[in-house]
Amino acid sequence: GADSYGIGTDEANDVDKHVRRILSMHRSIRANEESIGKITAKQEVLKPYLGLDVPMQISSTKTAFAKVGSLDGEWNMERLLTAFSEEGAEDVHIEIIKSTKSKTYLWILYPKNRDAAVQAVFRKIGFAEPVFSLSHHTPKKKIEVLETAKQALLSENEGYKKDIMNCVQYLDEIKLFYDRLLMRREK
């Protein structure tokens, strides 16, 4: 062991402890950065739905289904209503949450007994529900909740970085220990 190289066990344990602590904090920073990336991506996906003032998770009432999703391209209300009436699904309530040239984001409420007709329209026009899990919060509130989580991770990372910088005081000790190990090994 370290003793046979003229290096004390206590010294070896101290150096090992410092190195392990630094590596552990570095791994935590990496994991937090990955989580921050995922949170930011979720926030971006939610942004088009900011105009929705009900939780995205609401999918039905006693008598109606509620759907949130998007269509490719820019759709106006007239075009949407025409697409639904062509399939005999006139009794739908549609809210255009946001519309851009490339996407139209919708919230649709319709009677449960019209589900087959509405699903046919969805297939025909390419209606796509969000790929993320729907929240029991409104999109605005969910973005705020995610932001709070992201800020906590950023703050945690700042703490780790400060702790790692404080470990600089052990750098000479670690280098000296490592050099002595190498020298002993080369004997």
Which residue stretches match the model-derived regions?
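Long, charged N-terminal accessory/stalk domains
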Residues: G1-K187
